[in-house]
């Protein structure tokens, strides 16, 4: 049963030169646990039921909007990158230009911890958020108590590419109409899901509607994607990481193959690996997998 936990109202912090929207759940005196979203995810993407269960395990949960989404600072003055030439540059191994970098986003997260007077925290990042969490651990190891990397890669070449039908869905601009946005979210969830966990379409529609109403920003998502495309592999840095690390991945991930998770676990000294059978590239959309992830994080952060 989900226990009732303390919850902050919507708040903003000045971090790394921008405004970051955040909230917290749980005992303010408990061990801090920072949640970092993937591409386009807002803080509410971390479902409150999931966060409440984590908080009930004895954590102060901190969730936030990455730059350019939700209620955090937008970078509209940077324009909207054209993804076609960026994709061509990436395929040719050329340097990809982006309005900002994943390192900037890692610095945002560290700045948020500074603003909250949190000297160190457990960090959990999903997908792009996993890459951001890697950079936090590489650049600020003394600030990271433990690292949990979920559905992420190191940006290392040579792995099977995403399935074309999945990539085409993700490269589509997010609709600016509410109903179209909800339907697009459902299409994405179907493309990213795994065989082991059936989709709850009503659950996904409700979450998508809330996300649209709160702060959908298609241009910001495109800029985030450009930052992700521009990011170099961090494998060499992770080889010498001394932060306790847990790698979680789905066996059926159609976007980032499970081999990427195995590679991360083999790269970070002492890293633990949890492969969830039947899970795709989705976590918050499938409440049936939450307990496995929460149990694993709780064991890892003891």
What are these regions (language model features)?
Residues 130-141, 147:
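Short glycine-enriched nucleophile-adjacent loop
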Residues 254-260:
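Conserved alpha/beta-hydrolase "acid-adjacent" motif
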Residues 14, 18-92:
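Conserved HGGG/HGGXW glycine-rich cap/lid loop of the alpha/beta-hydrolase fold
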Residues 91-99, 103-121:
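Conserved acidic catalytic loop of the alpha/beta-hydrolase fold
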Residues 271-302:
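Catalytic active-site module of serine/aspartate enzymes centered on a nucleophile-bearing elbow/loop
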Residues 241, 247-249, 253:
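Short beta-strand/loop motif that positions the catalytic acidic residue
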Residues 162-236, 263:
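Alpha/beta-hydrolase
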């Amino acid at each position: 049963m989900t226990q009732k936990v303390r919850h902050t109202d919507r708040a903003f912090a000045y971090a790394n030169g921008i405004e970051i929207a955040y909230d917290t759940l749980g005992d303010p005196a408990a061990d801090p646990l920072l949640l970092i979203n993937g591409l386009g995810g807002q803080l509410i993407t971390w479902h409150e039921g999931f966060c409440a269960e984590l908080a009930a395990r004895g954590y102060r949960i901190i969730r936030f909007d990455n730059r350019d989404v939700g209620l955090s600072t937008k970078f509209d003055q940077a324009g909207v990158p054209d993804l076609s030439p960026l994709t061509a540059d990436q395929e040719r191994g050329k340097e990809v230009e982006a309005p900002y970098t994943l390192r900037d986003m890692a610095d945002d997260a560290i700045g948020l911890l500074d603003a909250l007077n949190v000297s160190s925290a457990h960090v959990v990042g999903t997908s792009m958020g996993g890459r951001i969490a890697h950079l936090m651990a590489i650049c600020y190891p003394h600030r990271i108590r433990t690292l949990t990397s979920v559905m992420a890669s190191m940006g290392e070449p040579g792995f099977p590419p995403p399935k074309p039908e999945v990539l085409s869905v993700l490269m589509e601009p997010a609709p600016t109409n509410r109903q179209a946005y909800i339907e697009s979210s459902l299409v994405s969830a179907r493309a990213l899901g795994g065989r082991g966990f059936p989709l709850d379409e009503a659950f996904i529609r409700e979450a998508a509607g809330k996300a649209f109403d709160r702060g959908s920003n298609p241009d910001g998502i495109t800029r985030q994607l450009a930052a992700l495309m521009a990011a170099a592999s961090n494998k060499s840095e992770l080889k010498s990481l001394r932060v306790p690390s847990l790698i979680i991945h789905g066996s059926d991930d159609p976007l980032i193959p499970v081999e990427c998770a195995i590679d991360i676990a083999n790269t970070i000294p002492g890293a633990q690996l949890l492969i969830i059978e039947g899970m795709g590239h989705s976590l918050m959309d499938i409440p049936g997998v939450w307990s496995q992830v929460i149990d694993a994080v709780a064991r890892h952060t003891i």
